[in-house]
């Protein structure tokens, strides 16, 4: 299992830590990144032998870590089009993310990955425990994700970002 990103409330790191504290000891979670909640992550990783805080990683190291993981978890509470999700899918890694705008545009639930209710550590834990033993299911979703990510060339991603920001502006008016 891997989380790669900013260690902040909006990225869902607190929910992930709550989930991590309940993970069986044979499931290892790597957390790579930095941010305001770094000390909280470091503290729990000192207490849990299956939680490994890696700190900030270069892009090359991060992609190697993602490629070597069974599942990338993105429990964000708010997110645009996630480059981390797209990178994980391009690496052929299965993804699990919050069912929020931005993430749900990338993950097709039960086809290219799994979606979970945001801010729900019980559901996140249940989906992890459901998916990790099912290697064939993970590989199938990872392959579907790899096909899906091929359509995200930069022109399409740029348009998605533009639409996302325009929708935010329209909500504010």
What are these model-derived regions, one by one?
Residues 3-22, 29, 36-39, 114, ...:
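A conserved mid-protein helix/loop that constitutes part of the nucleotide-sugar donor-binding site
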Residues 41-57:
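Nucleotide-activated donor-binding/catalytic signature segment of Leloir-type glycosyltransferases, i.e.
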Residues 56-57, 64-69:
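Short alpha-helical donor nucleotide-sugar binding micro-motif in glycosyltransferases
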Residues 94-97:
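Short hydrophobic beta-strand element within catalytic cores of glycosyltransferases
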Residues 109-110, 114-121, 130-135:
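Conserved acidic donor-binding segment of nucleotide-sugar-dependent glycosyltransferases
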